[in-house]
Swiss-Prot record:
Signal peptide: none annotated. Its main location: host cell. InterPro entries: Phage_1-C74_Orf1. One of its GO terms (cellular component) is host cell membrane. The chain crosses the membrane at residues 688-708. Keywords: Host membrane, Membrane, Transmembrane, Transmembrane helix. It comes from the Viruses. Pfam families: DUF3688. The keyword Protease does not apply. It is a single-pass membrane protein. It comes from Spiroplasma virus SpV1-R8A2 B. This is Uncharacterized protein ORF1. Belongs to the plectrovirus ORF1 family.
């Protein structure tokens, strides 16, 4: 009998040894092996094959896969068979199309460049020099300042308005930056004051000699000899006027009418010529200002010296809870790329708006030795804090590939934007790609020591402190601001039929919702899900780029179908929380629309299972004190032969029971203590294993060990 049991046990183990790998391998097939229609990409020729590329770009199976420490999604090197270099063309295209907020071509427009090259003749042709000397060494700023000053003086309101709206330095301060020539010449009427107050300024005087009927103009620096001459010319009625130059440098002598002695510069004809030039050049000047403001070079002597393209990433943080003084900070990264699509330089800087707590600049440039880049970083805090009290500066060499991988592997989070007004007014086809949100918490915890090409431990610690200080941010932003997007108690009264609420998931992320949770207080409600595919950049006149969205996979759901209550008993009455199961879509969604079907109805939304909630609030009781939220529901087997269901239930038991395994989604979260993803846990656990071979192997071995121990007891 024992022998028969032993043979039976061996048979069962052998059978399971064959079946379990088959089941698991079937469950964990790569996405590109599923029956999906994907656009096949040819080999990039940059050290990555077609399969790796498809896995990298399309294996986005769940929201909290995006937080996995072993996930390729933000750092493709973790999933591909070969290490990617920072200058791989498709890698840059991937970052550009998924996360960048703009692309600038780092060459000025030909029209503006011709103004620079032909300025010597243009300033005479259009008589600009009669009003102002535009300096070529600071050509763009000086020309812009002249046009603005001229427009203000001669009441060209449309021109000054265009400059204020497009040139950053005029948005806050509308005063002219420069004076026109006529504003620098001051008419002197008190000649006695001139004698008593000697200065070293330039003057010009209009007078005529006793032997001549023609008026003449003379320029001089203040000295006593001219003071005495002026007195004699006044007595002889041969004096027209005296002017003092209050500008910088030596001025040009104005032109006069020799018969009348009147100054002919700045007359109506000359004004009209300048106005013609402004009408001709304003658009090009404004576009050039925009290009330079976005990181383009203003070196017009060597327009080909720098990279041909700059990829811009604007990472934004906003504290909207402080209504009286909204604080906004924009962290901007710029990667300068040459014609061979190689990164040759870049920078990372902080610009504060209504917030001067911290500022920094981190720039780097290629040395010519592969991935080795020289860097220079500086940081300054205007507030007294424990972490940073003074100006710091550090320079050296680092590995750019490792820096970019570390940065993008930690920096990006999905952005959920309230697009209700756009959707309500039928603008869903015109969604704009807005500023990217950066995860400063993860960046602050990132260890940047390994990217520094130096062995001195003190230098490494200083470098790490420098970068971590750059990514310093208040926890208030994460605990409060993000919750305002998905407030658990957000009541909305519908004032008209088909009232809609919509959001867009940004930062290149897709959501894979399985359940939608909602209140039972409303009467009728529908939801819609879209998959909005962002087109690649298309460029307007080489000065900027915009995105368009193509919508597909739109799903309409009656909220009452396939729904039920999350909790029973007292909790059902307490929360009134219902769920609706949603059909699984492998390609994911990034647009969600909530639509009420009854006038004056009230609805309350609890979002999808990808909720962004305060982790501590959920874990400390918060919405669901009984902690049943995290329990995975068991699968009902079709019969004793349903080994798949038995295997799944065994895994569910492990997840719900064994300490540590229960927190598996925390292991899959790079943000850990900041966000918890509320999920249909069972549906996602196999997805987590697929991207974490170590975790998959561990739990599988535990499961096999349990089965083995059962059979040992039988034997």
């Amino acid at each position: 009998m024992k022998k028969s049991l032993s043979l039976f046990a061996i048979f069962i183990l052998t059978f399971l040894g064959l079946v379990i790998p088959f089941i698991t391998l079937t469950a964990f097939r790569p996405l590109n092996e599923e029956q999906y229609t994907l656009k096949q990409e040819s080999s990039t020729g940059k050290g990555i094959n077609e399969t790796d590329f498809i896995n990298t770009m399309f294996l986005r199976s769940s929201f909290f896969e995006n937080w996995s420490e072993t996930n390729y999604f933000i750092n493709p090197t973790l999933k591909t068979s070969k290490n990617l270099l920072f200058n791989d063309k498709w890698y840059l295209d991937f970052l550009q199309d998924s996360y960048s907020t703009g692309v600038v071509y780092d060459k000025p427009g030909e029209i503006f460049l011709n103004y620079y090259r032909q300025w010597h003749s243009l300033k005479n042709k259009y008589m600009v020099e009669k009003f102002y000397d535009v300096k070529k060494e600071n050509f763009l700023n000086d020309l812009t300042d002249f046009i603005y000053a001229f427009a203000v003086k001669y009441k060209m309101f449309d021109v000054s308005k265009e400059i204020v709206e497009n040139v950053d330095r005029y948005k806050e301060n509308h005063y002219p930056r420069v004076k026109l020539k006529q504003d620098n010449w001051k008419l002197i009427t008190d000649y006695n004051w001139l004698k008593d107050n000697f200065d070293n300024k330039y003057y010009f005087v209009i007078w005529k000699q006793s032997y001549s009927k023609e008026w003449e103009i003379m320029k001089f620096k203040h000295n006593m000899r001219y003071d005495m001459k002026i007195e004699s010319y006044i007595k002889n009625n041969s004096f027209k006027g005296l002017y003092r130059w209050d500008g910088d440098g030596e001025p040009q002598t104005p032109t006069i009418d020799k018969n009348t002695g009147e100054i002919t510069d700045w007359n109506s004809y000359q004004q009209s010529r300048v106005k013609q030039f402004i009408d001709l050049s304003l658009y090009s000047v404004l576009q050039e200002n925009i290009r330079v403001q976005q990181g383009g070079s203003a070196d017009y002597e060597n327009p080909n010296k720098v990279g041909t393209k700059r990829i811009i990433f604007d990472f934004e943080t906003v504290d909207e809870l402080d209504v009286k003084n909204i604080k906004k900070a924009i962290y901007r990264m710029i990667l300068t790329v040459d014609e061979a699509n190689l990164i040759i330089s870049g920078s990372l800087e902080l610009n504060n708006i209504n917030n001067d707590d911290l500022s920094f600049n981190f720039s780097f440039m290629r040395t010519g030795m592969g991935e080795v880049f020289n860097f220079n970083g500086s940081i300054y805090s205007s507030l007294n804090s424990k972490d940073l009290k003074y100006y710091q500066q550090f320079s050296g060499q680092f590995d750019l590939s490792k820096f970019l991988q570390s940065f993008f592997a930690s920096a990006l989070v999905p952005v959920f934007q309230n697009r209700s007004l756009f959707i309500e007014n039928g603008y869903i086809d015109n969604l704009q790609y807005d500023t990217v949100l950066v995860n400063f918490f993860a960046l602050k915890l990132q260890n940047f020591n390994n990217i520094l090409l130096i062995e001195n431990i003190n230098d490494k610690l200083q470098f790490d402190k420098l970068l971590n200080s750059m990514f310093k941010i208040s926890q208030k932003f994460y605990t409060n601001y993000l919750r305002t997007i998905f407030d658990l108690e957000n009541n909305t009264y519908v004032q008209g039929y088909n009232k809609k609420y919509g959001l867009l998931v940004n930062n290149g992320f897709k959501i894979y919702p399985r359940y939608f949770y909602f209140s039972d207080k409303y009467k009728q409600l529908d939801i819609k899900l879209y998959s909005a595919f962002k087109n690649r950049f298309y460029t307007i006149n080489n000065y900027g780029s915009v995105f368009n969205y193509d919508f597909s996979v739109a799903n309409n759901y009656n909220i009452k179908l396939n729904s039920g209550y999350v909790f029973g008993g007292d909790l059902q009455n307490k929360y009134g929380l219902q769920y609706k199961k949603i059909e699984e879509q492998k390609i994911g969604y990034n647009v969600f629309e909530l639509q009420a079907q009854k006038e004056n109805d009230m609805y309350r939304y609890y979002d999808f299972n990808f909720g962004i909630y305060n982790w501590q609030e959920i874990n400390n009781g918060g919405l669901f004190p009984d902690k049943q939220w995290w329990q995975v529901q068991y699968v009902t087997p079709k019969g004793w032969w349903d080994f798949g269901a038995h295997i799944k239930n065994a895994v569910i038991w492990i997840v719900n029971t064994i300490p540590g395994v229960k927190q598996v989604n925390e292991l899959a979260s790079g943000v850990g203590k900041v966000f918890e993803t509320v999920y249909s846990f069972f549906s996602q656990i196999f997805e987590v294993w697929k991207f974490n071979p170590a975790l998959y192997s561990t739990i599988t071995n535990i499961f096999l060990l349990i089965i083995f121990m059962k059979f040992v007891r039988l034997i």
